[in-house]
Design a protein with these regions (language model features):
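Conserved, single-site charged/polar hotspot
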Residues: 1-243
Length: 243
């Protein structure tokens, strides 16, 4: 679909691979050594029915926007927040970990995403798919367990002073969490034992320690207790119209 006109520029057979390339400032399909221009610099790929779209060997929910940027093609996954989280939780936390820790991860990741929407707007999208924002692997990394963690916490976010917080987290804090959030102190971040003793510090150490969350879950903490431990005096809110 041409992004500019909203008209279909071509139909592609399912389960077949196609190569899209930049060609004379437009997007073209490469086949048999020939280039077939689609006559536009931005297109949307989406399934005709319920299904997934694929690029570079990975499957994604929603739709893919492909656009020209500085002579190169940029691929953007456009999907709902809850579907996005299904690709974040197993990318950020091992699916084999405790279920309550996975639920805590889902709530933290949802809060982080909403608090940072538009962070990468200068590039034409909201968030990157790596740890500069949050690791995201699309539908290819989903598991039943992590999907259930997302679904059982649908719409739940962390708030402080009636605002959604960017719920920072890292793999491990090395014994104590860090209060310094990139040059500023946030009232809901206080240095606390991270319950990840024996695990080398990995990451910025601000907010929730993922190893610590898993260890607390093993001790019987539920997702809410885990999050209230790492983020002080926060409240939980449920989105009315989650997208």
């Amino acid at each position: 679909i041409d992004v500019n006109t909203n008209k279909t520029v071509c139909s592609l057979d399912a389960m077949k691979g196609y190569i899209l390339v930049p060609y004379k400032n437009e997007i073209a399909v490469k086949a048999g050594g020939h280039f077939y221009s689609l006559g536009t610099s931005a297109i949307v790929l989406r399934p005709d029915t319920e299904g997934y779209v694929s690029t570079k060997g990975k499957w994604y929910r929603g739709k893919l926007m492909v656009k020209m940027s500085n002579g190169k093609l940029v691929v953007i996954n456009d999907l709902t927040l809850e579907d996005y989280l299904k690709g974040v939780v197993p990318s950020e936390m091992p699916p084999s970990w405790e279920f309550e820790a996975l639920k805590a991860q889902a709530i933290a990741a949802r809060s982080f995403a909403l608090a940072n929407l538009g962070k990468q707007a200068r590039f034409g999208y909201d968030l990157k798919d790596n740890t500069e924002d949050q690791a995201y692997g699309g539908a290819s990394v989903e598991t039943n367990k992590t999907n259930r963690a997302v679904e059982e916490t649908t719409g739940l976010v962390l708030t402080y002073d009636m605002k959604i917080i960017p719920a920072y987290y890292s793999a491990s804090a090395g014994g104590m969490t860090n209060t310094n959030a990139w040059g500023g102190n946030l009232p809901y971040l206080r240095s606390v034992p991270s319950f990840d003793d024996g695990v080398k510090k990995n990451g910025h150490g601000v907010g929730m320690s993922q190893h610590g969350a898993n260890n607390l879950a093993k001790e019987g903490y539920n997702a809410y207790q885990i999050l209230q431990y790492f983020y002080q005096n926060v409240k939980f809110a449920k989105l009315n119209n989650n997208t």
